[in-house]
Swiss-Prot record:
Gene Ontology biological process: organic acid metabolic process; xenobiotic metabolic process
UniProt protein name: Probable cytochrome P450 516B1
Binding annotation for heme: 438
PANTHER family from the UniProt entry: CYTOCHROME P450 307A1-RELATED, HEME-BINDING MONOOXYGENASE FAMILY
A GO cellular component entry from the record: cytoplasm
Top-rank taxon: Eukaryota
Transmembrane spans: 1-17
Cofactor(s) needed: heme
Main location class: membrane
Gene Ontology MF: a single term: heme binding
Xref: InterPro entries: Cyt_P450, Cyt_P450_CS, Cyt_P450_E_grp-I, Cyt_P450_sf
Subcellular location field: Membrane
Amino acid sequence: MYLILSLIIFLAYVAFHKKRTNGMPPGPFPLPIIGNLHQLGKSPYKSLKSFSDKYGGLTTIFLGSVPTVLISEPNILREIIIKNNDSIIDRYISDSGLIIGGERNLLFSKGSFWIKYRKIFSSAMTNARKFNIASRIEQQAISLNNYFGTYANSKQAINPHDYIRRYSLNGVIDYSFSDSVEYESDTHHIVIRAAEIMEEILATGNPHDYLPFLKPFYTKKRNTLAMAVGQVWDYCNDAITVHRKTLDHEKPRDLLDLILMEIEKSEEKQFYDDDSLSKCLTDLIVAGHETVAITLGWMILFLSNHQDVQQKVYDELINVVGKGNLPALVHRKDTSYLNACIQETMRIRTAAPLALPRIASEDIKVGGYTIPKGTQVMMSVYGMASDERYWKDPHIFNPERWLSSNHSTENGGGGGGVVGNSSQSEVFIPFGVGPRMCVGMGVAKDELYYCASQMFMNFKWSPVNDKPIDDEGVARIALEYKEYQVVLERRK
């Protein structure tokens, strides 16, 4: 009797699933309630790539009861994100997303709010170059490398993790607010500690985002996240108050000054309020530094393991910059090999294996399939960056793939590594694609270049006892490295 009843229930569920996915892309069969969550394993980004390998560039999965379409093919991505932009521009907002921004920040907002605030931030960041605000990042890179210098030639192994994270956070809060923390200080700046708490909570994922009935079991975790977010909001609100009182329109100090100036010029300045502005600034602090910190950590690891590559970077910097001189952004166009190393690091160990999800605001027809309104849509950044159809030997660290006599690597170009008909700009999207592309991309690239150029011009980085460092990533929301130790030697 129970067997027959179970069979009837199972067949009814199969029929229900077939009906609700009619016309959608293929994918693995989901279980009731949990969907395909049980199949993601310890390395979700790898599991999702295996789904794409099996089912194609458009794959349907269920995260809990949330229907999700995974994109892992560039021509499909281009058609969906670019050609159907108005139908796919909004974010899918989870419970954690609501806690972080309440739909009034840059990462997790929709409609006119997102459009207007992004425009203000984008304009301010463009103007930041006119006022040389990036010089603040340069000074942070100098401070970090001066600190590394205290370890050089001591033969003392160090773990660079905490220092590069402090650099990336310092870069953001100095660039944005004219604030920073000394590298040798044991004191945790309140915003740095709050950001660390947020990252710790978000890094491992939150099951209640897709299984809402679990919320009561995650009350403490959700409250801790809300408290940490609130501390950063308060910090940003205080900074807004101080900056507004001390603003000099002729001599803007940082990004926040420029944002306030943009708001003053706006015909809709009444639309912008301090609480929403503080939430948007929080995005820069928390999300803005993550890519930089993780990429620099991976870059030190790979160049320590590949001494021949590191030597080529050093030789290029000496040739372009000259001994005794300081690398600067003006040198970037002439340091193609260093640029290639940065890009190869971001490809082989992309900090964000999955771009933040979007939601279809209406039915989308693509590739003979339908993505129904309300479906969560994810882009597999890792999947495209490691697909053998587009990259030769994708799991090998090879900066040479980015070099071409006909292309520059300065801004993400290069033509040497992609096979088939896709260009690198289509299969290499560490900062996203389309209007939702990371608004702080330019700042992140500057942070990476300033720090990497100084690190590899001033020091030789080596594994402890010349034993190769483990380059397997830690599977979290971001693709992080396992913490490691290296030995520094000052270049002569």
